[in-house]
């Protein structure tokens, strides 16, 4: 039996209120419903629609199994979310090299979480999406997206989640009036190494709008 590792780290937080009427349905559906109606699109769907067949096949090939990227990502995201919520967590000890360095990342010290895996929506585009975290550090409000890689060497080569962060920035502005995000960051966790990549707000917005434009022209008019 693989050993389990227990973590606890309570935060005192003042969280943003969830968006009224917005619900997320996870695996296997991965869909959002807003005020009783299903949203036709998700951020993931928009960004993945023009993924090259070779890359899509590679992702599918390495997705499944106890050491696949889905199991790894789910486990590490769960610990990260529970940590920010101030809840204890238990995880398979094989993920400790990722988790230990992630939770020791200097950026994540002395922060105040505002939202953790809290769904957002753009009601005009009818798209739902969920940032991993929105938090305060110093005078800045961050939107953070967590990515995991299988090997330590992959941390440095992993790109920032530019269009994804741009989507969350847009959604947060419409869902949480008066909350002005000033920093966008991709947190990349590997075994024994963690790296943060910052994105310019304007570039992230442009990347998201470009992705949405390519996607939306292929969709039927309702």
Residue ranges of each PLM-predicted region?
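Metal-dependent nuclease catalytic cores that hydrolyze phosphodiester bonds in DNA/RNA
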Residues: 1-128
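Mg2+/Mn2+-dependent nuclease catalytic core
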Residues: 114, 118-222
